[in-house]
Amino acid sequence: MSDVIKNFFKLESAGGILLVIAAAIAMIIANSSFAPMYDTFLHTYLGGMSVSHWINDGLMAVFFLLIGLEVKRELLEGALKSKETAIFPAIAAVGGMLAPALVYVAFNMGDPEALSGWAIPAATDIAFALGIMALLGNRVPVSLKVFLLALAIIDDLGVVVIIAFFYTSDLSVLALVIGFVMTGILFLLNSKHVSKIRWYLLVGFILWVSVLQSGVHATLAGVVLGFAIPLKGKKGERSPLKHMEHALHPYVAFGILPLFAFANAGISLDGVSLDSLTTTLPLGVALGLFLGKPLGIFSFSYVAVKSGIAKLPAGVNMKHIFAVSVLCGIGFTMSIFISSLAFGGANPEFDKLARLGILMGSTLAAVVGYILLHISLPKKAA
């Protein structure tokens, strides 16, 4: 294994540890006498948006840009290059969205108002899932990490579509049109072999603003920009995509992701009782994440492989896939976002119950997913 790849994994592992520490600190503060200060900080307005908004829709767009760059590189010259391998995470993601939603609906069939939260357990929190995986360092095969990246991003893109169609009542048509135009310009630049990153960043910023104003989750702009950055530069030039990926990684690992965890993991447990935890809404969310996710992802993956529709990534077996499918039950921030859309305005009590379910399901998925990965992975990197 080259020194570059070794350093990459060391960096990511350290960033993953910092991410978990930041989340733990947020939980402690949110349930202490410092909770009002924490809340005030997150709701302080800067330039027309709260600090929380800037982190979730601004800085996280940079994280999604990095994800887009990594997935594109793997699609063009890495583990997802072949059609059979590329289709595998897409099929798994479909199962990972359907099964959790069905579990939630089964628990809340008798409550029409609660049913509006059906999409809450359908999401996978890429940041936290990668953070847990990164704790295992270079024991994780590159192909397994890429599978998780691709699966999670397809999953979250699917959730963004769900949000746009089912949870957005005030879409701005003008902003969406501008966003589509900017997307077209980005891929026009790519087709014309423009290799200067500054032009992509300029158009990408306008795309981000338009998506933010459209009512659609602004992080989608980061994904689109990532896929537009060219892999190959002009003759004699370094790869624009690899250069940007290398430049962004330390800022994302040690800055954006820990800050993101700190801003979103602070859920107050004040007033929580055993009775409230065992009602159908939090149970539907928790079991949708902890049971529905692995059930959907693993079953769809198994059928896809056995039928010959897709093939396993190199160096990966079905035990690894099952462990990752459990890890994908970490819905956390995206699930919280959907909960706020489904219940936040109309029913704050339902929103709190859903968040409790998200906390339970995501914690179980993180702990069990880590244990399963620890058991199934080789003790040392090959």
Swiss-Prot record:
It is found in: Cell inner membrane. It comes from the Bacteria. GO terms for cellular component: plasma membrane. One of its GO terms (biological process) is regulation of pH. Belongs to the NhaA Na(+)/H(+) (TC 2.A.33) antiporter family. It comes from Aliivibrio salmonicida (strain LFI1238). Disulfide bonds: none annotated. The keyword Magnesium does not apply. GO terms for molecular function: sodium:proton antiporter activity. The gene is nhaA. The chain crosses the membrane at residues 14-34, 49-69, 87-107, 117-137, 146-166, 171-191, 205-225, 247-267, 285-305, 321-341, 356-376. This is Na(+)/H(+) antiporter NhaA. It is a multi-pass membrane protein. Pfam families: Na_H_antiport_1.
